[in-house]
Amino acid sequence: MTACVSPPAPLVTPKIQLQTDALSRTYPSGDGQITALRSFSHTFAGGMTSVVGPSGSGKSTLLNLLAGFDTPSGGAVRVGDTDIHSLSEAGRADFRLKHYGFVFQSHNLVAILSAQENVEFPLMLAGVPPRERRERARALLAQVGLEGRTHHLPSHLSGGEAQRVAIARALVSDPAVLLADEPTGNLDTRSGEVILELLTRPAREGKTVVLITHDPDVAALADHHLRVRDGEVTVER
């Protein structure tokens, strides 16, 4: 995919930093163990960071650890002053709801909810009053160019439109961290360009966007670059 996205605006200093400290993950295997991620220390200094590497290299392991979906064998993940892995499972879920947004290769929209209801869903879980969540959802859908599709079910949206709904849902809680796993993988070139344009906006606004991709053209759009191979993470300039 050759991406034609507008040149980035200057980065805004992030309000909350995402940091890893000697982060590692091993899994038992027969009589030994497999190291999926080796001691990784890094500060994600806002903007967009691409994570590239071959299949099975440890990219998904890193993303799951950053999100608190998986438990590290050692080290820490901090968002601001909070070590997310020191929280209980319920505490991590609540923390993610307030501070994280997620965009996956498959949009993962709830099939029986409209576009607007899907965007409202995280706000409903957070206890935001109905009127406020409706207003915020409509505003985000307008920002992603879907103000005329608010009442459509996911089955009545194109792949690109559904992914735009997913981005609106990811941003509606104003998260500090946005994690995106191959968000353009299932899309045609033009739809992919639209999605990348939308992902660069929060990066310019001081949010930390971590983007997993296999596409070098997509990775080149990021401000910072990480490469993962055999569990080793290197920072590329």
How should these model regions be labeled?
Residues Q17-V228:
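ABC family nucleotide-binding domain
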Residues M1-T26, T234-R237:
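ABC-family P-loop ATPase nucleotide-binding domain
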Residues H225-R237:
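H-loop (His-switch) and adjacent beta-strand-loop-beta switch element
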